[in-house]
Swiss-Prot record:
InterPro entries documented for this protein: Herpes_UL82/UL83 (IPR008649)
Protein name: Protein U54
Superkingdom of origin: Viruses
Glycosylation, residue list: N76, N100, N281, N321, N452
Gene designation per UniProt: U54
Upper taxonomic lineage: Viruses, Duplodnaviria, Heunggongvirae, Peploviricota, Herviviricetes
Pfam families found in the cross-reference section: Herpes_UL82_83
Family indicated by similarity: Belongs to the herpesviridae UL82 family.
Residue ranges of the TM segments: none
Keyword NAD found: no
The species this protein was found in: Human herpesvirus 6B (strain Z29) (HHV-6 variant B)
Length: 459
């Protein structure tokens, strides 16, 4: 008797899906097939096109809100019609366990010298409250002298100012190395850096605003409250770009540095001036969000280097708003994710599945090639005979040249509501399978695609 829901676990699931549909040249569509996963702990679930697939699909992460019924994208990048009933969509799904790092985006940076001749404001009063391992500072500054800067997004105001705080009789050992902003009296003002020079604490203050939405100008007075704690973070950012790089637990959400209305010819870029340090322990891995009509490159974010993201349009008139999410950065130990020195640029990341075998010349990664096998229209869930649960295998990202062995992956619990003709050709063991194959016409349902237009809102 067919179970109401198929359930199984696997390190890698390969989809080899067919459907009675034809994609025109350049056509991009989204679909669901009823496949879901149980939420994994501290892992990012990725989907990537297999190198055997004629249909393209972006390398992306699955948003947790979509775990119940995963959406996929399929794109015909050829000049010919693509018959999805004859040429299957081939995707690989796997989960990477990221490091649960702590991130300090506003460290107190000690410097030796600073130009003290031009006092940047008329009045500054500070109250220091000492709680042992915490110092709270309440600041009032007036007659602030703002300096205009040129933003990357031309519809925005950008002004910088310094606020100097005399430490008075506060012991330097109470000026701890990690700061947290508790209150700023103006919503368009942020603190990008905090510097300590002798008995002077310097707040590098930023006023940034979209004047098309809010034509208020920079404030002449500010009330600020911040706290300092002796916190040693795994990742230390060189500056705080809170509207663009938002620190989460275990990841950083990356937002666009400007408003973008795409064309089909010219790639566009977002660059971030912030770098990070981790004492050579971690490497950042930027994984794009699935955005309709926009292709975003995956990249390695190396320590002490700025983050640089390249995009291009797959459809006309797709819009990305300032600070709109482009993807997330996850951090991995350098033993798993080495620096990205040998990356080949590619708009469409592809993957393959391999088995580690011993040869006379040493270990070899033998590609698991399934492309030569015809895909039945009848849906089925199978395993590959020689890829047993005990075997050493993994997944390789071709452009990034990164191999994730099985010990660096997390098995996923999958579930699927099957059709009457769906065959499950193995009994799910207690041990997760290394590789499972879901193939055939499982009932793909194409879903409406919406342009990335959204009402404009200030961050």
């Amino acid at each position: 008797m067919q179970p109401a829901t198929l359930q199984w676990s696997s390190y890698v699931l390969q989809l080899r899906l067919t459907t009675a549909a034809i994609l025109k040249p350049g056509e991009l569509r989204y679909f669901k097939c009823g496949l879901g996963i149980c939420p994994p702990s501290s892992s990012v679930v990725c989907t990537c096109r297999d190198e055997s697939s004629f249909a393209a699909s972006p390398f992306t992460y699955i948003d947790p809100k979509d775990y119940g019924n995963i959406p996929f994208a399929v794109h015909n990048i050829s000049d010919l019609d693509l018959d999805l009933g004859r040429l299957p969509i081939v995707l690989n799904i796997f989960a990477l366990p990221y490091a649960n790092v702590t991130v300090s985006n506003l460290p107190v940076q000690r410097i030796e010298a600073y130009d003290r001749h031009a006092i940047p404001h008329g009045q500054c009063e500070a109250q220091f409250i000492l709680y042992g391992p915490l110092t709270r500072i309440k600041i009032y500054a007036a007659d602030i002298r703002w300096t205009e800067k040129t933003p990357e997004e031309p519809t925005r105001y950008l002004f910088n100012a310094d606020i100097w705080i005399n430490l008075q009789n506060t012991p330097l050992d109470q000026i701890f190395n990690s700061a947290k902003i508790e209150f700023i009296s103006h919503r368009h003002v942020s603190i990008s850096r905090i510097l300590l020079c002798g008995n002077l604490l310097i707040l590098k203050t930023v006023y940034e605003n979209d004047y098309l939405l809010d034509d208020t100008f920079f404030p002449e007075k500010l009330n600020i409250q911040l706290s300092l704690t002796p916190h040693t973070a795994d990742i230390t950012m060189s500056q705080n770009q809170e509207t663009l790089l938002k620190c989460n637990v275990g990841s950083i959400t990356v937002g666009a540095t400007k408003n973008i209305v795409s064309n089909l010819i010219t790639p566009f870029h977002c660059s971030f001036h912030t770098i990070f340090e981790s004492n050579s322990n971690f490497t950042g891995f930027f994984i794009p969000k699935l955005l309709h009509g926009i292709s975003i490159t995956t990249c390695i974010w190396d320590e002490t280097r700025p983050l640089y993201i390249t995009m291009k349009a797959q459809k006309k008139n797709c819009r990305i708003n300032y600070s709109q999410e482009l993807g997330k950065v996850f951090f991995f130990p350098k033993q798993i994710l080495p620096p990205g020195n040998n990356i080949e640029f590619s708009w469409t990341e592809m993957s393959n599945i391999y088995v580690n075998i011993e040869s006379p010349n040493g270990p070899v990664k033998d590609i698991v090639a399934l492309a030569s096998q015809p895909v039945s229209r009848a849906p089925s869930l199978t395993t590959v005979a020689h890829v047993t649960p005990e075997i050493s295998m993994g997944i390789f990202l071709k452009s990034l040249r990164i191999a994730f062995d099985k010990e660096h992956l997390v098995p996923l619990h999958f579930f699927l509501k099957p059709g009457e003709s769906t065959r499950m050709e193995f009994m799910p063991p207690e041990t997760p399978q290394s590789l499972t194959i879901l193939e055939g016409d499982v009932g793909i349902r194409f879903i409406p695609c919406h342009n990335n237009y959204s009402h404009r809102s200030s961050p």
